[in-house]
Amino acid sequence: MLNIIKNKIVAGVIASLFIVMSQSAFTFDVSGENFPANFKMTSWTAGNGKSTITSEGIVGEGYGKVYLTHNFKVSADDGMSGEFTGQARTINQDGELQYASLQGSWSREGTIVTMYSFDTLNNGVINHAQGKVDLFAGTLKFEVFEVN
């Protein structure tokens, strides 16, 4: 009888640990120094299972005027999530030009697309950007975190 109780307690503890561990495995939270990057959509081209959005905006941190192209591909059967690739070009008032490759994942709920991106710049900087695209308002609003 004592062994049965002991086994049930051990099983309960293991189940509790599994529940706690699995909950933390599905959370994604980024913290630390970041800067805002806000853009206005300039075009949206739709295709079969894909879309391309271009946008532009002024970004601090020395980037200046930034032009973005995001190529979205649907990967879920319901059409509500997928991957994207893209390019960025920046030019500041001193005429310094930078470029970056963009890649990440997206999901959509209603008019809002949530994006998680890792961006590699030509100067070696890697940024993580996370934010939201409002398809109705035509805005893109990101928080950018320098990875390295």
Residue ranges and their predicted role:
Residues 2-13:
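Bacterial N-terminal signal peptides that target proteins for export
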Residues 11-21:
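Bacterial N-terminal signal peptides
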